[in-house]
Amino acid sequence: YRGGGHFSGRLTAALCIAGGIAIQMLERNGIKVKAVLESVCGQESAIDELIAEAISEGDSLGGTIACTIEGLPCGVGEPMFDGLENRISQAVFAIPAIKAIEFGDGFKLSELKGSEARDEYMVSDGKINLTSNHNGGILGGISTREAVNFRVCIKPTPSISIPSKSVSYSRGENVELKVSGRHDPCIALRAVPCVEAAAALAVLDLMLGDINFSGRFVFND
């Protein structure tokens, strides 16, 4: 078979179509969703050369994607099961090959003290603002009006031309598995618009389901 079956990246086409509509609706309300490829195989430069080398070896590479949501008003989300982080994560993990997500400073927060990691409030020019954004624009599952930012990990596809070890269930013996077909050497390159789409859909769904936002949501220019 060609491609990855029900985990094929082709199936994200529908996600991107729906997400494209959500992105436009959010933009009309001053909210912008933008994702970028941050690194491939841990490197932020010479990416083309890395991918070319992987292709020549018949191997694949993982990568990281960073996403930012700007203009999101304060109060989007819920404190428990429908928190903003929860809903974004649920949508993002629908994208094949994503294995991890972190918001704000993410795992680096585990290395800090509370006095270093907390985002403090202060009044400036008559407005209440945060002095930092270590938590990625979300506190207690609810948006803080700061930019929401998160990063995702894309694993390298196991569908490569290098043979792998497997088993024959019917024969009860070890076999060598050879994969053929068309497979991307680095899925992360194609996953950028998918991450944007998933994030936009999650945010839009939360806002339309909240009477505090849905009543003043602009649907048309």
What would you call each of these model-derived segments?
Residues R10-A35, D82, N86, Q90, ...:
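Alpha-helical support elements that line or immediately flank enzyme active sites
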Residues G30-L37, A54-I65, A97-L109, D210-F219:
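Flexible, glycine/charged-enriched surface loops at secondary-structure junctions
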Residues G4, S8, D48, E53, ...:
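Generic hydrophobic-segment detector
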Residues Y1-L11, C74-E78, N133-L139, R182-P193:
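A short glycine/serine-rich beta->alpha loop
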Residues S159-D221:
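Internal helix-turn-beta structural module
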Residues G58-L61, I65-N174:
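Glycine-rich anion/phosphate-binding loop at the beta-strand->alpha-helix junction
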Residues Y1-M80, L84:
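Glycine-rich, mobile lid/loop segments that gate access to catalytic sites or pores
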